[in-house]
């Protein structure tokens, strides 16, 4: 089998995504959806119907395993030479999406398609996530993604040789949200494995309201704080925080964050949040929680 498309999902109905992929799925390919212990019964029921579709398999975890473990399990189930990871909150924008990947496989090992966004913010309460994602997309044109292939690596939409993935895998120690893609990108870099970036984007539909997004950001920063210091020095926000600590300014940074946090949050929760203040909020919070 040439290709296995792997879709991990948690409380996300991905039936439309699967149907859109089936319309362009080659005969020597499969789609596997793994539900990571979703708590919403209606979503579990809808996703379970995927098992009845041709060339599709569906698996449901009894409990939430986390973003890394569920992806590793999907790779173990896969029968394809290539595995294509797609997040369940993705939307297909091209009828040639799969073909665009397959025509790039000769001599390649890892291929990243990229992330796209809605043309307009879906609602004011999602302004922070939308503004951040759109700016990130604009700052990562194909030319830059190819110039810095590892720094721009994302697990949202990428394809990799299965045998290679099984040698690296996602870090099972990461159970909560955040940085499994960072670690995987660093692992590829350390092994000097070439990463090809192409313009084959999926639309990211999973934009959370700002309060929920800030909770996710805090979770990802807690995840980062538990990583080895050698890893932290290779990631921008933690590297800056470690420098602040080295300069004996951690206490001051924490104090400054504590007194400014209410005003920062007020801005971030508004309809026109400042991404500069968002950066300062993340840095201040990390300074506060790091050891």
What are these regions (language model features)?
Residues 219-222, 237-291:
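Non-catalytic, C-terminal membrane-associated alpha-helical segments of glycosyltransferases
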Residues 61-78:
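Glycine-rich, basic loop-to-helix element that forms the pyrophosphate-binding segment
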